[in-house]
């Protein structure tokens, strides 16, 4: 299983964002360094950019605001970082992708992180979208 490394500060910031937004899902873009596997991902997450969730039912769905998403992508790249992928939260669900998450995934080879607040301690799951399905990544917080 491929590994995604997440800086401790980045993980803490993702969890804080999820808690602030609960009971609605929150979302954003992950920045850092792509891995060196030729496909570019997974890699290391060192930062995130929050993007407003504009879904009609944000308690159970997420949709990144297109203009804010573009601005987040640009901010990460302008800082000299790579766009590693995207994140969203599951305030009451598991840290694995839902059927809706799979149906809406659009960036092949991108990392999709999910912050789950369902358990006593928050969980961070990571997945790589192949273009057809999600492949689970191991997560190491460093």
What are these regions (language model features)?
Residues 1-84, 91-142:
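Conserved beta-strand-loop surface patch within small alpha/beta domains used
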């Amino acid at each position: 299983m491929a590994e995604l490394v997440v800086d401790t500060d980045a993980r803490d910031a993702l969890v804080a964002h999820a808690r602030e937004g609960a009971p609605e899902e929150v979302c954003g873009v992950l920045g850092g360094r792509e891995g060196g596997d030729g496909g570019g991902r997974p890699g290391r997450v060192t930062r995130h950019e929050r993007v407003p969730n504009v879904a009609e039912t944000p308690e159970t769905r997420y949709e990144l605001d297109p203009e804010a998403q573009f601005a987040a992508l640009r901010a990460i790249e302008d800082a000299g970082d790579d766009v590693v992928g995207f994140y969203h939260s599951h305030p009451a669900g598991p840290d694995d992708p839902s059927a809706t998450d799979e149906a809406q995934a659009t960036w092949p080879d991108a990392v999709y992180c999910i912050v789950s607040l369902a358990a006593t301690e928050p969980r961070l799951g990571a997945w790589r979208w192949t273009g057809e399905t999600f492949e689970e990544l191991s997560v190491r917080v460093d």
